[in-house]
Amino acid sequence: RYTFEVLKRITSKNPQVEFHFIFDRPFSKKFIFSSNITPHILTPAARHPILWYIWFELQLPKLLKKINPDIFFSPDGFISTKSKYNSIATIHDINFEHRPQDLPWLHSLYYRNFFQKYARRANHIITVSKFCKEDIANRYDINQQKISVVYNGVSNTFREVDEGKK
């Protein structure tokens, strides 16, 4: 939901800017919010740590070289450590650092190995709370000036529940 809401607003508020949305599989046209978006499908579908590596470290740098973006924005924290483009990564939290046992072994290993690299490589990091900002900064030895807190918003589709329905 975060990605949908943020990108819908950014693209509609900036019609003069060209956006490239990069998908790892066929996508719904509902994700192409406006005419200033060019969609790309980059394979393989990144649904496993080995495929994440192929997608972000091998395939994505090739596509970014063709697109030549001013900024690469990652709403889920994953970026390419091999790409030289400016990047902004949203790292929602780093719970996998504190509770690695809560994830499948290979997922946990990937996150704990790469997210520190992503955080250091990103030009800027967005996170969802002051606690997460301090956690990322302290755990990864990142200057807090590099991290902005952007609280989660609420979609216009959410409505107050009638007292009788609670």
Kindly give the residue locations of the regions a language model identified.
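Carbohydrate transferase catalytic cores enriched for Leloir-type hexosyltransferases
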Residues: 1-166
